Amino acid sequence: MKGAVFLDRDGVLVREIVLDGEARAPLRLEDFFIVDDAASQVERLHQAGFRCVVFTNQPEVARGLLSQPTLDEMHRRLSEATAVDEILVCPHVDSDGCGCRKPRPGMLLEAARRADIDLRDSFVVGDRWRDVDAGRAVGCYSILIDRPYSNCSTADASVPDLTSAVNVILARGEAPPE
């Protein structure tokens, strides 16, 4: 078993857009921008031996505001730009009651099962309480990228940006060998 780093998509690897004063996930390809340091930070994690998995809630799919082909193209671009190992998506809304929608840990458990990941040797990096709580539910070390909208006090660490989150991960030790 090996450790992994689970990265939230919006607000961590992808810039959120502001609509009506709220930070939201981009719904159009022309609004989809990968943060400047995403590729270099994923590379640092890979060099340290970590598998990098994106896990993201995308309820706009269920609401009919984001088409599956557009989401697929966004994720193709993200994979190409950052070389993440896997992207897991929950397309449901809260009322669906699925096990994959954060803060429930279903996506983390699925990734762990498929790739033989030890969740206790893994990290979650997110910008909202849902990300942190999903990680904590399965024993991951949870790092919050603190944003004005984050509203979370339960993270194991709080940092201003992705580079700082990766610094925390690497300071805690490299991933165990495969």
Regions found by a protein language model. Give the residues of each.
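Anionic group-transfer/hydrolysis microenvironments
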Residues: 10, 59, 104
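Substrate-recognition element of Asp-dependent hydrolases with the DxDx(T/V) motif
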Residues: 38-75, 84-96, 135
